[in-house]
Amino acid sequence: MESPTAKLRFGYVEKMGKRYVQKYFLNEDGSDISWRAFEKHFTKKYKKTRRKRNDILFYTHGFRAHKDAYQDITNYNMHKGLYECKDNSYKTIISLVWHSNLNYKAMRGKTIEMGERFAGIINVLLDVSKEKKSKRKVSFLNHSMGNRIFEGIFTELQSLRKNNKPYIENVIFAAPDIEASTFYKDGTLEHIDRFCNHAIVYRHKRDLTLSMSKLINLKDRLGLDGIDDFTKIPTNVYLIDVSSAKKTEDNHDKISRHGYYTSSPVVRQDIFNILNPKKAKPYPIRTILDHPKNLSIQDVEEKDNKKKLRR
């Protein structure tokens, strides 16, 4: 049996009044259902959907974010501000939940292996969903240390599927607590262009949480330090600087500047535009910095935007 600090779970969200509560698929005795049982449940439910397109988003949270209080805030912001939007085609949201204790370094050392374990069932779900909806798209949204989980998922999926052409639409790296060198030669994600069509990294230059991580790891963090040389990384990678986005719906984020992917309306809208390019709003406008794929966004009002900048 897994220890509580190594538990991997598939979650779903249930609306209870004004709250969006994280739930899990359980047996009658309160234990988690097996992954095989989850596969059967997913297959049955996905097959019944009437939409021609029912795109899938795998979401992976960060360190200690399996806690109910954090999940409540995240679920509320993301459902109200993104998932439930009328034009959002990603109607199947699968939460990859991993339990962690307070030992940051110890948990960080386990995350790649956790991701590799998740990859086995994800691989099955990719095939099941493709069989049921041939035109469905799949994307990943990862936050903070959840991006380390994704690195494990990526490594194992590439081994299982042995694809040289992208089979995932988007991978969104929100405030990634991983090495800034991950896309460079010999980095874990050196071949991300064989995995997805678009790899989008959000960074904040004053991310307090990642500043602390940098001190602990003694290495640059992708979500803090960004990318130095775009000529040495895959061409499908974009970097979006959100340091100028001040508005937040979470008081805690005013200090940490780390959870903007859920609390910042302008960042949520940018994520919506990435996932739904045909229904994208003309805002936020992306400003090109020193490279066409090094961009920034800032808080703006809808009425002030008159044109749409395509990816």
Give the role of each language-model region.
Residues 55-56, 136-138:
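Generic beta-sheet signal
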Residues 67-68, 148:
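Loop/helix-junction capping segments adjacent to catalytic residues or to phosphate/diphosphate-binding pockets
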